[in-house]
């Protein structure tokens, strides 16, 4: 009776009745138990109603259980309001969404307080997000209807918030609108939706990209009101209403950084300034961005007029060489972003990875830029519509249109499903096979392999079409006649040729080439090498011309040649492998640290031609195996140390090169740096133990362990990280003297051993040093012994250590020790970290430490990513503070890695989700940029003097359109992080 009563009023338009075959269950038993467990906690009438719908519609039941299993975000929406779930399932989704928007507009129109508006918009977002997700998961709406619904939701939310703010300003007498109910009309305030929002293609957890402009002679402004402060204040209010994190969530994250020069301009710009900027300084990527621009709120008439004025900037009537070169440069920059990453499944980024969504969008937008000036029909916003018109006008084949369209729809669906898991703006697939197995089921596949087959097929087809976009030589240089590269700076034909390739200093390059071709360097004295090199020079010059700074690349290669004693094999390698040469050019141009390493040890290039180079990063087991091979036949202790240094430098070079080329995520690189260091530390530990014992013998019952602290402990190392180490030992008290020819007493033995260990790392040989070692984190720092006995270490941590030492201990990790001794040390550390603490005392100590660091290091330099206010130190302190305060009652919070500790704190409810969604992306941004800066900059980073190649690599690492946008993002991020630090820990003047 209950079942029939509940379902009798449903018709076939109801969302519940329209579910088709959707997700599959990864663990059906666990999923069913989780769903049933939630139902059991509900009021009986609610539980019965939801259960009846599930029983009546089996596909719906599986989808709901799949959400419980795979999507914490959607399951939270469901659990947060069972009545909302019933309301969504029982109605027709098209009518329900329209009613939601209508009701919200009615409520906001009557609201008198900003808090009421914020609450109403968040209620709207929560129900609409659940409804749209269910329509996507259940196959009720095709993917582009889903994106349009998300776009409509965003656009109406922006308009509602803006209308409220302008109504408030009208009430204060600052504007006099002709229509008080629609105060935006005739206001001269223009809100442009950019990117996917502009094209009606918004993804599930997307930021909304907006640019706000205003007319200087805004007709509705009161006479005494200055336009800029007024419109900036309104824009800030708009951003606050939409994106401020509260207990009831947020509406949309707002990104205002696509405006002209965002690092130095206010959040709202006059149309006069905008037009002047686009005319004088507008870049090709900004032209591409404007293809999708659409007035979405504010004065729509003024918005359309502004786009008409901007149109000549976007749509050029004639395609000159410079424009074509810009388009080609956009493609090169994107290739640099992707590096040479293989198409993959685990961890693949379906937006910017090979064969991804960005390549489809770029494929369409590039040809729109090229032809849209003469063919107005190409001036459309949606990607699929552009592909359709390009095919109809024979710019692309019907096959290209069909394959790219099908791939786009598939990849957008995958992207949505990834984002539904945790409502994060991510585009990367899970990075383990097990996680992909579960994700595949959530997407409706029966296995990881069946999903992988489809995914790889689409990615490969997209990549194939994308690769053909600039088939041949777009600059026309291949058609130039051959020249004499050794003719010198007097040969005008050579100079013209170098200019045509893009060199800015042809006289200097011609002089360098003349030196090469006459065999003036040691490496070129051998006739066969010189002959091979001469044949190779034209290809070399053409390839180096593709570098970001071609003249600097030639100079760097020249330094490499001068440093070589014997280089025939290197010349041969580069002549036969153009991809290798491109990579070497990037290294030489952007990372002097790596370039110097290459000049000293050219044999490290061998690693770049290993097929494994562009595959997965080697794990610890593989690194250990490689290290064992490197050391296998070393004959002496000194040779062991030399080979260790060579192994370390080659590993650093290979990881650094992968960071530069964009072929490994920087977080994986950080782990790889740590794995290399850990493998070397373990090897040195064993080697020094044996070598030391041969002279001094051993102490009865002796055990030694190396405790990694800092970046090695947390596995967050960079190319320039030193090793923060503590040596811990123990032995039998009844026989404290060693049994060697030169006997030492207990503590003296281990102190001498530790000094020998440090020397093995820091002694400079022909191959440099292994690592700088810092032992100041040991008990009592420099004043204490260099090695600590375990009981003394435990007593110090328990009775004497300062709060900062316990903060540092959250990163402590035993990396070399016998298993039983390792366990004893870990027990000591865990006991210290999980003891009960006074939160107020810890917060005060942390705030005081932050103030002291600010006084010593300063915190005003935005690009000091570690120490700036709101920088990485703030995030580290937050993670460490949460661990010390909460580990007593929630020991699962503990983790040596900052991001993992934040994840644990969020999962355990000890860090608000809203704060986590600021801190985690901030930490990733800082780590991404820090990896680049540690590779490429030895002194303080100054963007005003940095080379364009470095700036481009940083822009790529920060996933920004240009450096100005990146700088604006860093500033905004630091402000947000500092606000959280001040709220959680205090010390607003920290």
UniProtKB/Swiss-Prot annotation:
Its cofactor is Mg(2+). The keyword Membrane does not apply. GO terms for cellular component: cytosol. GO terms for molecular function: [glutamate-ammonia-ligase] adenylyltransferase activity; [glutamine synthetase]-adenylyl-L-tyrosine phosphorylase activity; ATP binding; magnesium ion binding. Residues 1-474 are annotated as: Adenylyl removase. InterPro entries: GlnE, GlnE_rpt_dom, NT_sf, PII_UdlTrfase/GS_AdlTrfase. GO terms for biological process: regulation of glutamine family amino acid metabolic process. Residues 478-990 are annotated as: Adenylyl transferase. The keyword Cytoplasm does not apply. It is an enzyme of class 2 (transferase). It catalyses: [glutamine synthetase]-O(4)-(5'-adenylyl)-L-tyrosine + phosphate = [glutamine synthetase]-L-tyrosine + ADP; [glutamine synthetase]-L-tyrosine + ATP = [glutamine synthetase]-O(4)-(5'-adenylyl)-L-tyrosine + diphosphate. Keywords: ATP-binding, Magnesium, Multifunctional enzyme, Nucleotide-binding, Nucleotidyltransferase, Transferase. Its EC number is 2.7.7.89, 2.7.7.42. PANTHER family: BIFUNCTIONAL GLUTAMINE SYNTHETASE ADENYLYLTRANSFERASE_ADENYLYL-REMOVING ENZYME, GLUTAMINE SYNTHETASE ADENYLYLTRANSFERASE. Belongs to the GlnE family. Involved in the regulation of glutamine synthetase GlnA, a key enzyme in the process to assimilate ammonia. When cellular nitrogen levels are high, the C-terminal adenylyl transferase (AT) inactivates GlnA by covalent transfer of an adenylyl group from ATP to specific tyrosine residue of GlnA, thus reducing its activity. Conversely, when nitrogen levels are low, the N-terminal adenylyl removase (AR) activates GlnA by removing the adenylyl group by phosphorolysis, increasing its activity. This is Bifunctional glutamine synthetase adenylyltransferase/adenylyl-removing enzyme. It comes from Rhodopseudomonas palustris (strain ATCC BAA-98 / CGA009).
